Amino acid sequence: MLTLFSVPRPFHGHYGIIQRNAIKSWTLLRPQPEIILLGTDDGTAEVAKEFGVRHVPELEYTEQGRPLADSMYKETEKVSQQPYLCIVSADIVLMGNFMSAVEQVAQRNRASLMVGQRWNLDVTEPIDFESDWEPELRQDMLARGEWGPRTGEDYILS
């Protein structure tokens, strides 16, 4: 049904922790989406292998070294087996209600666009995904988190 794709930052320090948390959360979604990590930044290939997701290194970049959005979509479309594509920031933890929302949108109309806004929560340690992590993280988010900017598009599903 769905391919999640992202261009992670290098997996160093705090960004390494939050991106690993996010990508692990994606692997736990049901139904399980196809997951593609794009680019060649440090750790991308290794993390893709660690989590059993696809790695596509080929991308076109701007002169400033930023990946081109059309290149991200083009490379994902070449290998994706799913009807819906969702670009998602590599630091966004997705919970089970995400797939419920995707399914609702898919049932209404094939030609859809879904965007989302993040909650900012400072998570400095790996999440214990063996525990009852979703309710615990949601409770922490409601207690300490803040809405991200309204202009932030942290995932775009089409």
Each model region followed by its residue ranges:
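Short loop->beta transition adjacent to catalytic acidic/histidine clusters or analogous donor-positioning motifs
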Residues: 2, 24-36, 53
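Active-site-proximal specificity loops/subdomain of glycosyltransferases
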Residues: 37-85, 95-96
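Conserved catalytic core of nucleotide-sugar-dependent glycosyltransferases
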Residues: 77, 93-158
